[in-house]
């Protein structure tokens, strides 16, 4: 997982489903050093172990010209320094994978998966990626070149991977999240002062 909930929270329902099918399976979460979410009780109750490694990210700002990128000295310096974090994280991940000897690596994306993917490649551990968005993230595109299988939230045509390696699985959703019918939608809209037949757009 990465440093945001978008990469991490889908891991919980997946982990619970795996535990339900095989209570003896051992699940290890490798996250970014310094993140707070993995210490939550919800994580501690489903993962057998949690570990943290260093990693760096490649900062890029869509819509800017190449000249703007070249003149953005601060970003260039930060990207250069973060390369060393990726290298350090790769050594840390290599040691962790040697210690725990996992059967498979599941990559949900986020820049922390790059060192783990590199270490898994060196240790010849199979990798499975999952992309929730219609566009694969940079980290999964990097790790994806070594992956055996790509699970996706959207149809295969949206992804750059070999088509025979893609399975559209949808997005893991917590079992406590239930579908909402139109009647309940109308009721909830009235509660917050919206017309029951009005269109509501949620931006997160």
Segments from the language model and where they lie:
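Active-site-proximal region of nucleotide-activated glycan assembly enzymes
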Residues: 25-28, 34, 121-183, 194
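Conserved donor-binding/catalytic core segment of Leloir-type glycosyltransferases
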Residues: 195-204
């Amino acid at each position: 997982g990465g440093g945001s909930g978008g990469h991490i929270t889908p891991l919980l329902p997946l982990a619970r489903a795996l535990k339900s099918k095989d209570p003896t399976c051992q699940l290890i979460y490798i996250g970014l050093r310094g993140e707070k979410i993995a210490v939550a009780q919800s994580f501690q109750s489903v993962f057998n172990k949690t570990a943290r490694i260093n990693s760096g990210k490649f900062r890029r700002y869509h819509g800017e010209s190449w000249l703007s990128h070249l003149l953005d000295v601060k970003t260039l310096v930060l990207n250069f320094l973060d390369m060393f974090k990726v290298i350090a994280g790769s050594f840390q991940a290599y040691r962790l994978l040697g210690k725990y000897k996992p059967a498979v690596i599941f990559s949900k994306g986020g820049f922390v998966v790059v060192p783990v993917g590199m270490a898994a490649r060196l240790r010849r551990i199979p990798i499975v990626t999952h992309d929730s968005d219609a566009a694969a993230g940079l980290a999964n595109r990097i790790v994806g070149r070594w992956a055996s299988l790509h699970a996706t939230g959207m149809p295969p045509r949206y992804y750059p991977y070999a088509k025979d390696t893609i399975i559209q699985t949808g997005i893991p959703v917590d079992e406590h999240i239930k579908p909402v019918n139109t009647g309940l939608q109308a009721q909830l809209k009235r509660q917050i002062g919206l017309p029951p037949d009005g269109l509501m757009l949620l931006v997160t």
